[in-house]
């Protein structure tokens, strides 16, 4: 079979202006970036706010293998299949980060015959959103350091600057650096570091802002440092929120592209799901809901991370809550959770499927706690056997959850027709009674305890020495009513990536909190989660090249 990029390059794309006509978007409503990419105008976003809100489908997954379980591919294939059965559908996805694209993923725009296009553009520079976010983040760093250098009127303690620079690459050498070296004209020397762009609070802010004025307000509320008397220093204290908003004035507009089958797609924003909230922009999802009858969106990594954050952090900012949740599972991942080594995942092992099913079962039960109907989608691989598939279907039937096979990677929309029909039937016959896991008035400790005990299945929460000091500090600063964004490994319900399946006898330790007061949530750091990834021994970049005619190769 052709590679993903070969399939993508074989498709005759339609002009994006033609694609978006099917959802009522005219030529004057878009700002073109070439023939096949566009941004949606503010006027159109405002104009559709009075329109009826469609049905929202959230795609999530079980705890993944390192290769991922195909959420983006399944989301795209499901949207194409829904369109094929007569449902007016759009898709709302995150933008890929160039770091993982060049590192381990090699591309993140779906796969096989379920892709968003133009695939090369989306995976590389797209409409420049990542660069604008990087620029805004680093402009803040430059202006902050300049304030300290030019007299430090706010009495900023340079030992307590918490704002980091960013770059959209995996570069472990930049995790800890010292800036201002050389001479007094180079600024005040201090410790600093780089995060990857998608870990920037500005990315999270962009994805939660509801309009330009809300973006500016959120930017103004970013905490960047503390003064010598431990008072938080905000962007608004530096009086630079206007400049940062100016840099991002076009970035906030959602990007329009298409799938292989011509389904309109809004691809916008891309915060990490293990260290941020892991969902595409509120603006893109909200606008899609007013343009289409059905909207398919996804949340990063497993349901314990991305879906929990979608439901507890993003959903309160949307015009509606999910009408159905689709949990993507693969037999290889279930076998891994059942104790099979990575090298043996292609071998039939029905007993391992049974053992690993506990992971899927917990995710199903967790999503049901939110009052939303659940469907399981089995992302089919050629190594899957009839016995394994039959076993998984029986196990799903035993817990009364709808389940369908899907082969959208290989067969495109046709491979997702049964799944699409089942999802549509569930939405039409079962009501969603969404409720959050915790209340805003709960303390930070109470919110984390509910997440750990009700979603992860853990026993207790321990707070390290630094976290204990911060709990009082955050309460004194009035930050304790914000939602919690848990930063932990994506591979396990616990904070130990090697504890697979559905563990129960474990505790979670929160070592530190990070205030994301602009985004409007508090990050709780557990385990060894990194905000700047490193590259593997053989990065995907080694297989990438460009031919003399400009054709890209190696993007998987």
Curated annotation (Swiss-Prot):
UniProt keyword terms in alphabetical order: ATP-binding, Ligase, Nucleotide-binding, One-carbon metabolism
Enzyme Commission numbers on file: 6.3.4.3
GO molecular function: ATP binding; formate-tetrahydrofolate ligase activity
PROSITE patterns: FTHFS_1, FTHFS_2
One Pfam family, short name: FTHFS
Intrachain disulfide bonds: none
Family: Belongs to the formate--tetrahydrofolate ligase family.
NCBIfam families: PRK13505.1
Descriptive protein name: Formate--tetrahydrofolate ligase
Organism: Streptococcus agalactiae serotype V (strain ATCC BAA-611 / 2603 V/R)
